[in-house]
Amino acid sequence: MKDTILEVKDLSVTFTQYDRGFSRRTLHAVEKMDLSVRAGEIVAVVGSSGSGKSLLAHAIMGILPYNSAMDGEIRFLGTPLTAERVKKLRGHEIVFVPQSVSYLDPLMKIGDQIRNGKKDHSVKEKCLAVLKRYGLAPDIREKY
């Protein structure tokens, strides 16, 4: 059996919505979701607009909006994904890939988008490592 990379257990995401005065209500956006991703697997999260796909990603990345609350457990490589841990891993071990290609700039070279415009040598090496990890040739950096 392959090692589990990401495990989501009993995940719920709610939002507090404030109305006029002091009244408020709780909206249940994601309820009791389970997900497991093992080494070597490719997993697609599919659903209609508003079904919680992005909220799942935001919960994993630790970037839920201020008026939200999360319940449940998220583990990465067997260890709970705490706020401190996800902050260290975000952008390195765990990366958010937006669901819309409109977030990518068609006028910017691929390498520049990966490097976020930074030019120092260590960032260039990290860019090459990312391309290699996904089986892409180094010269793709110069393409749009």
Regions found by a protein language model. Give the residues of each.
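Helix-to-loop junction immediately C-terminal to a conserved catalytic motif
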Residues: 61-64
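ABC-family P-loop ATPase nucleotide-binding domain
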Residues: 1-26
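Q-loop/switch helix immediately C-terminal to the Walker
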Residues: 100, 106-120
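Conserved ABC ATPase "signature" region
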Residues: 124-140
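The feature captures the beta-strand-to-loop junction immediately N-terminal to the Walker
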Residues: 46-48
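Conserved ABC transporter NBD signature motif
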Residues: 69-80
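ABC ATPase NBD coupling module
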Residues: 80-95
